[in-house]
Regions:
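Residue-level recognition of tetratricopeptide repeat
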Residues: 134, 168, 212-213, 246, ...
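Register position in tetratricopeptide repeats
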Residues: 147, 181-185, 225, 259-260, ...
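C-terminal cap/linker of serine protease catalytic domains
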Residues: 55-119
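Flexible, gly/ser-rich surface segments that form the specificity/activation loops bordering the active-site cleft
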Residues: 1-29, 35-41, 56-67, 84
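Terminal, low-structured helical/coil segments at or just beyond the last alpha-helical repeat
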Residues: 401, 405-435
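Canonical tetratricopeptide repeat
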Residues: 140, 174, 218, 252, ...
């Protein structure tokens, strides 16, 4: 019998099973010869004992009715990845938050990548309602509000975390993290409730409740931001002698020592330790440490080791570092008299840099070409620079000197006179010399 519920009345219609099939080895699928199109999908079929044996599925034909085993319905479930499905994204309806908190967090993360901010806010609220003792929901809400400038709202969220969360240490730690991100990265100066001292207090409270080294590390980072470098270094140094001694700790210790005026020889020891804790082949995690050590070797005029680190960094970055890096490596290569690779790097810097920096890099490239007697190339590069900045006196001067070398004195003097007209006194010496 098909049981229909219509107009608040129960109606039953008798059906005869034409045949039944099995699917997934254990579920029944029934086909009935009769179909009057009156049943509502999902309506139950019951047997003589009143047991539900199937749920109605209307057929696309007019001659059959189908029913699926009700046990199969209990296996149907959604997962966090379903929020990315286009059919769900076309509606304003939110899905139910999964019972597993990790899956629920994944759902929120995936929702944050969509453009529906209302759904995202709703899912965060749903998560907090379902897992009020978990810190993650409050933190996610606070970070969203903070990024939108609602610092008071973010503060209120984290106070709720302190009140309701089971893990009080984690709540204090996340509170300082939310504050710290605003204090370090936001230009806002109106909201005065959050300070580095308050963030430090939260980190220390987290450590007091649960003495995890990560919380101690957080305190050291805040002290560094407060410019209390000696206190910060003391903690970093202590951490470097524990199981928490990772690359970041040694790198931060080196930064503290640099601010305290330590010698380069002391700093390179710490940076060596930072790089030594990176696994090979290097990944992006190692990038800042390898670059910092290369720059330190460069400052110590150990150009060979500096260049080795610069090359490793370029490999880590898949040749897509910024213009500043290629200019830095260019100068190192010039110091090693590796002029051809230096020219390659300065050309690449000019290619990837911001438009306003391009004339500067092109003038530098022309200067090296002049230095190594690539006179025709120096003129061409200087002309490229002058197309972007017609009054660039460096490019005009380099072009003039290159033209002198090419025995094109009238054109050379024209460039040098132009330099003088623009007020650059360097031209006087060369005008007198080549007049």
């Amino acid at each position: 019998w098909l049981v229909n519920f219509a107009d608040k009345k129960v109606k039953t219609d008798e059906y005869s099973v034409e045949r039944s099939e099995k699917f997934m080895d254990k579920y029944a699928y029934y086909i009935f010869a009769y179909n009057d199109k009156s049943g509502v999908a999902g309506s139950p079929f019951v047997n003589a004992n009143g047991q539900v044996i199937g749920l109605l599925q209307q057929s696309e034909t007019n001659i059959e009715t189908h029913a699926v085993d009700p046990r199969f319905a209990t296996t149907l479930a959604f997962n966090s990845l379903d929020v990315t499905r286009p059919d769900y994204n076309k509606t304003a309806i939110r899905m139910q938050v999964p019972d597993d908190s990790k899956q629920a967090l994944l759902m929120i993360m995936l929702t944050s990548e969509r453009q529906d901010s209302a759904k995202y806010v709703g899912y965060i609220a749903d998560y907090i309602a379902k897992f009020p003792q978990q810190v993650d929901g409050y933190t996610t809400s606070a970070l969203r509000k903070s990024s939108n400038g609602d610092f008071a709202g973010a503060d209120a969220d984290m106070k709720q975390a302190l009140k309701h969360a089971t893990n009080k240490a984690e709540a204090h730690a996340e509170y300082w993290r939310v504050m710290y991100q605003k204090l370090i990265y936001s230009n806002d100066s109106l909201y005065k409730e959050w300070t580095l001292d308050k963030a430090l207090g939260e980190a220390e409270e987290a450590y007091k409740i649960d003495p995890q080294l990560a919380y101690r590390h957080s305190a050291a980072q805040i002290l560094f931001s407060k410019r209390e470098y000696d206190k910060a270094y003391e903690i970093f140094d202590q951490l470097s002698k524990t199981s928490f001694a990772n690359s970041e700790v040694f790198y931060e210790a080196a930064q503290c020592k640099a601010q305290l005026g330590a010698k380069n020889e002391e700093l390179i020891v710490l940076l060596d330790s930072a790089v030594a804790r990176c696994t090979k082949p290097y990944t992006s995690v190692a990038a800042p440490y390898v670059l910092a050590r290369g720059q330190m070797y460069d400052a110590m005029k150990d150009y060979r080791r500096a260049l080795a680190d610069y090359n490793d960094y370029d490999t880590i970055m898949y040749g897509r570092a910024n213009a500043d890096f290629y200019f830095t490596r260019y100068k190192c290569e010039v110091n090693m008299r590796q002029y051809q690779v230096a020219l390659n790097d300065i050309a690449h810097a000019a290619y990837v840099c911001e438009p306003q920096m391009r004339p500067i890099y092109l003038a530098e490239m022309a200067s090296l070409q002049l230095r190594v007697n690539m006179l025709d190339n120096a003129v061409k590069t200087a002309d490229l620079c002058l197309q972007l900045d017609a009054d660039n006196t460096d490019a005009l001067l380099i072009k003039g000197l290159a033209l002198v070398g090419l025995k094109k004195k009238p054109e050379a003097m024209e460039c040098l006179q132009r330099v003088k007209t623009l007020g650059d006194q360097r031209a006087d010496e060369y005008i007198k010399k080549y007049k």
